[in-house]
């Protein structure tokens, strides 16, 4: 190949035990994603995680956390630099509902295709969770959902204009 791929240490850690196996006491960056963790460049959280890892940062991923409790994102401790948030490869409302506003029967970005593993408006929910779980740590928002809603926009689901997702999510 023209460019030698960076050496990786296996999958990015998803638990305290996996951090301990690497000899890490803390993360530099924690990425929270609405998708299952798939270590492939077609998944943004994995790709960003690998780029940050190649820069020498210690990166962990929390995939599809339980959004009803902040403990689901606190297992690996407070990250040193920031928390990265993405709803996943697809807008969370499109992942959860059809265009006719019916609940989807499956989710192609969840393990086993099981639906309901991400909340509606996942970027906002995960950002608010990160703010409560890690006070003072910057929250960086990215991904498809955040990109499509970065300015004031019409919300089809609520039939009204909504402000930028950055203000709704209180992201940095």
Regions found by a protein language model. Name each.
Residues 33-39:
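Conserved glycine-rich "GG(E/T)P / GGGxP" loop and the immediately following alpha-helix
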Residues 1-23:
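Short N-terminal or domain-adjacent regulatory/targeting segments
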Residues 1-6, 55-58, 108-118:
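Acidic/glycine-enriched edge-of-secondary-structure segments
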């Amino acid at each position: 190949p023209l460019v030698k791929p960076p050496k990786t240490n296996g999958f990015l850690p998803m638990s305290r035990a996996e951090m301990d196996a690497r000899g890490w006491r803390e993360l530099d960056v924690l990425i929270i994603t609405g998708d299952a963790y798939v270590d492939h460049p077609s998944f943004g959280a994995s790709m960003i995680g690998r780029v940050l890892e190649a820069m020498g940062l210690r990166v962990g991923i929390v995939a599809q956390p339980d959004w009803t409790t902040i403990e689901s994102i606190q297992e690996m401790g407070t990250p040193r630099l920031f928390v990265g948030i993405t709803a996943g490869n697809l807008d969370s409302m499109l992942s959860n509902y059809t265009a006719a506003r019916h609940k989807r029967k499956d989710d192609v970005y969840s393990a086993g295709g099981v639906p309901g593993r991400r909340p509606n408006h996942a970027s906002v929910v995960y950002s608010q969770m990160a703010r409560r779980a890690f006070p003072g740590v910057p929250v960086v928002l990215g991904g498809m959902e955040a990109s499509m809603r970065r300015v004031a926009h019409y919300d089809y689901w609520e039939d009204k204009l909504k402000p930028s997702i950055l203000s709704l999510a209180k992201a940095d």
